[in-house]
Amino acid sequence: MEKVLILLLVALAVAYAVPDPRGIIINLDEGELCLNSAQCTSKCCHREDGLSLARCAPKASENSECSAFTLYGIYYKCPCERGLTCNVDKTIVGSITNTNFGVCLDLGRATE
């Protein structure tokens, strides 16, 4: 039993010693398969349609199509980059079917 415990501790020490920021389950790069936006470094797990595999994608830039926050964690259109707002008419049906799409706008610049 002591040998198993020592082997386990050595394995954990080696695993923590490797300074690899890339993740297997979290901190996924763009293009890698994901199950939820929380896994991606960009915080956008995107799929083309209901039958495609979801992959990490960059957030939407200004004047690009976007989605408001979704409960599912997977987007058909990625949310906006930091500092931009997704100008969308939110509906209950759109929230359920994940079809609340809009356009990313910089509201600070739009009011000037």
From Swiss-Prot:
GO terms for molecular function: enzyme activator activity; lipase binding. CDD domains: CLPS (cd23011). PROSITE patterns: COLIPASE_1 (PS00121), COLIPASE_2 (PS51342). It is found in: Secreted. The keyword Transcription does not apply. Disulfide bonds join 34-45, 40-56, 44-78, 66-86, 80-104. Residues 18-22 form a propeptide. GO terms for biological process: digestion; lipid catabolic process; response to food. Keywords: Digestion, Disulfide bond, Lipid degradation, Lipid metabolism, Secreted, Signal. Colipase is a cofactor of pancreatic lipase. It allows the lipase to anchor itself to the lipid-water interface. Without colipase the enzyme is washed off by bile salts, which have an inhibitory effect on the lipase. Forms a 1:1 stoichiometric complex with pancreatic lipase. This is Colipase. It comes from Bos taurus (Bovine).
